[in-house]
């Protein structure tokens, strides 16, 4: 696996898998699989993509930006106990391939969901809320920021 030169050589084992393109393919596959399942249930294309976008947004918000610490014992356990999963990725180095993928994926989902609904205003605003909830915590100025002391 080719690593970015900006990434430290000793990575937190709890998040090192995120840098793998295979992980990105699997991540994309999970969203597409959910879309296929929803289509199989008879939901319209627009509703199915909105649900995929919401599921993705809610799950990634809690997994990446709410839960702190390392789920498995590692050398970085004490260093990461106050960091969210997102903050632990690539040992806090910004603008790596993994972070770019995870930043752009919800934006792509937003455009797919909005476009499949024909740019309907109601769907646009519903998906915009999810986009903000998913992308805003990933921005560099939000690194280690806990709003209103929540989750500190």
Where are these regions (language model features)?
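Cytosolic-side membrane-entry/anchor segment at the start of a transmembrane helix
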Residues: 1-27
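Multipass alpha-helical transmembrane domains of eukaryotic endomembrane proteins
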Residues: 2-12, 60-117, 142-152
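Membrane-lumen (extracellular) interface motif
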Residues: 18-21, 33-52, 112-128, 143-150
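Alpha-helical transmembrane spans of integral membrane proteins, capturing the lipid-embedded, hydrophobic core
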Residues: 20, 24, 28, 32, ...
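Hydrophobic alpha-helical membrane-embedded segments
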Residues: 41-42, 46-71
């Amino acid at each position: 696996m080719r690593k970015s030169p900006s990434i430290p050589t000793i990575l937190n084992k709890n998040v090192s898998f995120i840098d793998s393109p295979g992980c990105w393919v699997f991540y994309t596959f999970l969203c597409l699989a959910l879309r296929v399942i929803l289509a199989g249930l008879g939901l319209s294309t627009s509703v199915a993509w909105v649900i995929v976008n919401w599921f993705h947004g809610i799950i990634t918000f809690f997994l990446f930006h709410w839960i702190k610490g390392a789920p498995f014992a590692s050398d970085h356990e004490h260093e990461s106990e106050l960091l969210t999963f997102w903050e632990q990725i690539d040992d806090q180095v910004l603008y790596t391939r993994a972070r770019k993928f995870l930043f752009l994926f919800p934006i792509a989902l937003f455009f797919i969901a909005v476009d499949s609904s024909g740019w309907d205003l109601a769907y646009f605003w519903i998906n915009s809320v999810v986009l903000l909830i998913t992308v805003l915590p990933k921005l560099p100025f939000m690194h280690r920021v806990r709003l209103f002391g929540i989750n500190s």
